[in-house]
Design a protein with these regions (language model features):
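Cytosolic, long alpha-helical scaffolding segments
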Residues: 1-220
Length: 220
């Protein structure tokens, strides 16, 4: 439709390619850890596994911050891809916010310790899985922007698909919570957690839209 070019943005440097690949890897890995964190929390595991996972997310977030600084240094010190420099840095910043949202959810579970009745466990786990799938699709979208720009639109469509699925699951679970016999304050507390998880998809979709705009800019 837009005659997108298929050339790689990394034609001049493998170092930058490795750095950005490493950042996207971390975003993907944080999501996979988070997918396990929620069922681990719900199982009331007493062996410290939940706390270990939260600490792992914290460590990966720190690594992502370090890579962001390295990419910024590489772009400016070596004057690479000047026409796309600001877009790349903005993209990394927004993906870093996504990692922060994962981390924030972990901390909220750790500190506030919401009491989800067993009847809601499976729905919460499925919502979490959909959210992680959405971010995984975003990772593919970002990689395609740097490697094979013709694939950006197809991968971005997958992000939108999972975002809509997440909205459906969120609405269904929130409705079930408020239809239950739980006290109102507990209903509000549980809804807060469900909504915070769902918002990760909203951020992922915003970033995917951003990437598609950058892809169009590269094609003209």
């Amino acid at each position: 439709m837009f005659g997108l070019k298929s050339s790689s943005l990394f034609s001049d440097t493998k170092k930058l390619e490795r750095e950005i690949d490493g950042f996207v890897d971390i975003l993907s890995e944080v999501g996979l850890v988070f997918k396990n964190i929620v069922p681990t929390y719900l199982s009331h595991s007493a062996n410290g596994k939940f706390d270990e996972m939260v600490e792992k997310v914290k460590e990966m977030e720190s690594k992502a911050d370090k890579i962001t600084k390295e990419v910024e240094h590489t772009l400016y010190e070596e004057t690479l891809i000047p026409d796309a420099r600001s877009d790349v840095l903005r993209l990394l910043e927004h993906m870093d916010e996504l990692i922060g949202m994962y981390q924030g959810n972990c901390y909220h579970f750790s500190i506030q310790k919401p009491n989800f009745p067993k009847e809601f466990h499976q729905d919460l786990i499925e919502l979490t899985e959909t959210v992680v799938n959405c971010v995984e699709a975003l990772c593919l979208t970002v990689r395609s922007f740097f490697r094979d720009i013709k694939s950006v639109r197809d991968n971005g469509h997958k992000v939108t698909f999972y975002e809509k699925e997440s909205d459906i699951k969120f609405s269904s679970l929130a409705r079930r919570i408020f239809d239950s016999e739980l006290p109102l304050d507990q209903k509000m507390h549980l809804r807060y957690f469900v909504e915070k998880i769902d918002r990760i998809c909203d951020q992922a979709e915003d970033i995917a839209d951003e990437v598609q705009i950058y892809a169009i800019k590269r094609s003209v």
